[in-house]
Regions:
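Generic solvent-exposed, charged/amphipathic alpha-helical segments
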Residues: 126-134
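A glycine-rich dinucleotide-binding beta-alpha-beta segment and adjacent secondary-structure elements
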Residues: 135-167
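Flavin (FAD/FMN)-binding glycine-rich loop and adjacent Rossmann-like elements that form
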Residues: 65-70, 80, 89, 95-101, ...
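Hydrophobic, well-ordered secondary-structure elements that form the walls
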Residues: 1, 41, 94, 133
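Charged, low-complexity, helix-prone segments enriched in Lys/Glu/Asp/Gln
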Residues: 27, 118-125, 155, 159
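Mid-domain catalytic core of redox enzymes
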Residues: 2-87
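Conserved FAD/dinucleotide-binding core of flavoprotein oxidoreductases
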Residues: 7-13, 86-127
Length: 167
C-alpha cells in the first residue's frame, strides 16, 4: 500500500524478485490520468445538513464519457462525517477533474511561493465549483466559513504524482 504515484512507488523498491522488470517498465510507461482540483470547505456550524453519501453534480451539457478537464463541468461533493449525533455537516470537499495544462505555468515555483495570480486562479476555480454545486445545494455559499484548495501541482509536490495525476 502506498500513497504516492505507482511509478514512484515502484522506483523505491530496489532489486526485488517480487517486481519484475517487465512490470516496472509497464508501470513507468502508463499514461497518467488527469488531476483534481479540490476545495476543502470548513462550514459554519449548523447551516448545511449532513448527507451520508457523495453527490455528483454535472453541467447539463457535460459529456460524462469524455471529460473536459479544462472546464469545470462536474463536481463531486464529499461530506466528512460530523460529530456523533450531529445532523449538520462540518466539512465538505468539492473535487473536479483538472488538467495539468491549467497549472503548468507555476511548476517551477515552490509551494507557497507561486504568486498572487496562482491564488486568484484557485479562488476562481473554487467559485466555479461552488456556482455549479449551488444548483443542487443552494445553502452552500452562505455556509462557507473557510476554504483550503489543492491543484495537480499540490499532488505533484506532496505525493510525487507525475503531472498531478489522480492515478
Amino acid at each position: 500500500v502506498s500513497s504516492v504515484h505507482p511509478a514512484h512507488t515502484v522506483s523505491l523498491v530496489k532489486d526485488s524478485k517480487a517486481l519484475r522488470n517487465i512490470y516496472r517498465n509497464r508501470i513507468a510507461h502508463l499514461d497518467n490520468t488527469f488531476g483534481m482540483f479540490t476545495a476543502n470547505i470548513r462550514l459554519k456550524p449548523g447551516l448545511l445538513p449532513y448527507v451520508n453519501k457523495n453527490i455528483y453534480v454535472h453541467r447539463a451539457d457535460a459529456d460524462l464519457w469524455n471529460v473536459n478537464t479544462l472546464k469545470t463541468e462536474s463536481v463531486l461533493v464529499n461530506y466528512s462525517v460530523p460529530e456523533p449525533y450531529s445532523s449538520t455537516a462540518v466539512n465538505i470537499d468539492l473535487l473536479s477533474p483538472m488538467s495539468w495544462a491549467e497549472v503548468k505555468k507555476w511548476v517551477d515555483f515552490p509551494v507557497g511561493r507561486r504568486g498572487e495570480d496562482y491564488v486568484a486562479f484557485k479562488q476562481e476555480k473554487t467559485e466555479e465549483c461552488i456556482r455549479l454545486v449551488e444548483h443542487r445545494l443552494p445553502e452552500l455559499r452562505g455556509a462557507v466559513e473557510r476554504v483550503f484548495t489543492s491543484t495537480p501541482l499540490s499532488y505533484q509536490s506532496y505525493i510525487s504524482s507525475a503531472e498531478g495525476s489522480a492515478f
